[in-house]
């Protein structure tokens, strides 16, 4: 038998025969894989849409560094809605984004007023 005519020896013929007569199991696995990828992509798009909505809702606050003064807005550890709404750091301090997991308060704050116990503490 001629070597060019024998599909077992000719790489091109083997590739063509695999495309013309695909293995059903491989095709099924590929279809399942593609459908899983499509579902993951849809979930990712949904999360991106939700995140974008949160960003738009917080658009009144700064979400990133501004100018050269290191303002972080609501994300700053120095942020306070009454005293420091821009989230600027005091002089000689570096501004750090607030991370709830890192800066979680481990103990409850107890007021020590000494002789000033008659002063009402806001809650």
Swiss-Prot record:
Residues 1-16 have a biased composition (Basic and acidic residues). Residues 17-28 have a biased composition (Basic residues). Its main location: cytoplasm. Residues 1-42 are annotated as: Disordered. Belongs to the AIM4 family. The keyword Cytoplasm applies. It comes from Saccharomyces cerevisiae (strain ATCC 204508 / S288c). May interact with the nuclear pore complex. It is found in: Cytoplasm. Keywords: Cytoplasm. This is Altered inheritance of mitochondria protein 4. Disruption phenotype: Increases frequency of mitochondrial genome loss and sensitivity to freeze-thaw stress and high concentrations of glucose. GO terms for cellular component: cytoplasm.
């Amino acid at each position: 038998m001629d070597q060019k005519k024998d599909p077992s020896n000719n790489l091109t013929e083997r590739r063509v025969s695999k495309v013309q007569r695909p293995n059903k199991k491989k095709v099924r696995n590929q279809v399942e894989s593609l459908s899983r990828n499509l579902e993951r992509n849809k979930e990712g798009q949904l999360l991106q849409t939700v995140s974008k909505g949160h960003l738009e809702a917080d658009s009144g606050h700064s979400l990133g560094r501004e100018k050269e003064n290191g303002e972080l807005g609501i994300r700053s550890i120095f942020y306070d809605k009454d005293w420091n709404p821009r989230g600027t750091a005091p002089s000689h301090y570096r501004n750090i984004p607030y991370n709830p997991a890192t800066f979680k308060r481990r103990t409850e704050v107890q007021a020590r007023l000494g002789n000033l116990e008659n002063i009402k503490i806001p809650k």
